[in-house]
């Protein structure tokens, strides 16, 4: 999936591409995904449990189209020796964040939106059907749910609170008494 996050110049908060095919060869899938990422200019968050797509992008020189693990999903252990881009799909934190991202998206952008009195958009019926049948305990056959959730996780920006510094101008600049000299 490809997802438009907030943008003043384009439709926002909506999926713009659904890839619902299972080609016979993994390289065909990887090439299709690479072409879509290049065409749309979107970086992708991929599962890094299987290194094939990451290696394919690196081999072709397009590894800048792969996102690293989002900061808000990092743990102290995940920051150590992370060389592979993407995100592990077997981490409980990631599984929960993935499900919550889809749940929040459905609540905020699909169907009737109570606060605004309007109706949200989801143009891909196969993804809607996949979401309806999704079981968090058995995720293997829900490719569209997994890819749409990864797109949402990749688009999330978590606001990092600024820490107030203890900067004190009086301590920083030393003041000397002014003495006048008369000749």
Regions found by a protein language model. Name each.
Residues 1-69, 108-183:
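RNase H-like, metal-dependent nuclease domains and their acidic two-metal-ion catalytic environment used
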Residues 66-112:
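Short alpha-helix plus adjacent loop in nuclease-associated cores
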């Amino acid at each position: 999936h490809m997802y438009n996050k907030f943008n003043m110049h384009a439709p926002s908060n909506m999926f713009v591409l659904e890839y619902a095919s299972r080609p016979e060869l993994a390289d065909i899938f990887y090439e299709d995904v690479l072409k879509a990422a290049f065409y749309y200019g979107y970086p992708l968050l991929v599962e890094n449990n299987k290194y094939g797509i990451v290696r394919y992008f690196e081999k072709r020189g397009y590894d800048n189209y792969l996102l690293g693990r989002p900061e808000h999903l990092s743990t102290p252990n995940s920051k150590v020796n992370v060389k592979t881009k993407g995100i592990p799909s077997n981490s409980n934190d990631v599984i929960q964040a993935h499900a919550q991202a889809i749940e929040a998206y459905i609540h905020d952008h699909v169907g009737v939106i109570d606060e605004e009195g309007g109706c949200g958009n989801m143009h891909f019926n196969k993804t809607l059907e996949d979401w309806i049948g999704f079981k968090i305990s058995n995720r293997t056959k829900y490719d569209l749910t997994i890819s749409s959730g990864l797109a949402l996780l990749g688009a999330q920006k978590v606001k990092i609170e600024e820490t107030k510094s203890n900067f004190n101008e009086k301590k920083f600049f030393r003041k000397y008494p002014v003495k006048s000299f008369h000749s």
